[in-house]
Amino acid sequence: MQNTCTLNKKNSYSYDDLLASGRGELFGKEGPQLPAPTMLMMDRIVEMNEETGTFGKGYIEAELDIKPELPFFGCHFIGDPVMPGCLGLDAMWQLVGFYLGWIGGKGKGRALGVGEVKFTGQILPTAKKVVYRIHMKRVINRKLVMGMADGEVEVDGRVIYTATDLKVGLFQDTSAF
């Protein structure tokens, strides 16, 4: 798949770049978009490429700086604040969709599933940094563009979530989805 947005194809992206993606400015109005804050689950993408990763088909690494004032800590749970695990899973889906746009895919991104997710730790407001790592396994470029990847979430140097077979599709029309 050829990237038609070569001007925007970099190996790392700042927070401002990620916000531009949410406005449809990074990969164009027909490319996938990241969500806006407060659902944007990363502050930067520190590495992206098409050649490495566990399967040699692409790798993405992104980071989220943890601050006690992040909105989810105030409500999940009162007196026992913890980042919802589903937000870490969503961050991995967000990154697979971003990758599809980065390689030139067009359409609106939708999570399609995950093979298996394991949670072996938690993200507390006392943590400093979350690192997301995505290892692309496959990209299908037909009527539906779909990416499949494995991923992990690390907090302060310890892997706490793993996911296999993360699937994201890019749809030209989401009305029947």
UniProtKB/Swiss-Prot annotation:
The active site is at residue 76. Disulfide bonds: none annotated. Keywords: Cytoplasm, Fatty acid biosynthesis, Fatty acid metabolism, Isomerase, Lipid biosynthesis, Lipid metabolism, Lyase. It is found in: Cytoplasm. Pathway: Lipid metabolism; fatty acid biosynthesis. One of its GO terms (cellular component) is cytoplasm. It catalyses: a (3R)-hydroxyacyl-[ACP] = a (2E)-enoyl-[ACP] + H2O; (3R)-hydroxydecanoyl-[ACP] = (2E)-decenoyl-[ACP] + H2O; (2E)-decenoyl-[ACP] = (3Z)-decenoyl-[ACP]. Its EC number is 4.2.1.59, 5.3.3.14. It holds the Pfam family FabA. One of its GO terms (molecular function) is (3R)-hydroxyacyl-[acyl-carrier-protein] dehydratase activity. One of its GO terms (biological process) is unsaturated fatty acid biosynthetic process. It comes from the Bacteria. Necessary for the introduction of cis unsaturation into fatty acids. Catalyzes the dehydration of (3R)-3-hydroxydecanoyl-ACP to E-(2)-decenoyl-ACP and then its isomerization to Z-(3)-decenoyl-ACP. Can catalyze the dehydratase reaction for beta-hydroxyacyl-ACPs with saturated chain lengths up to 16:0, being most active on intermediate chain length. Homodimer. Belongs to the thioester dehydratase family. FabA subfamily. NCBIfam families: fabA (TIGR01749), PRK05174.1 (NF003509). This is 3-hydroxydecanoyl-[acyl-carrier-protein] dehydratase.
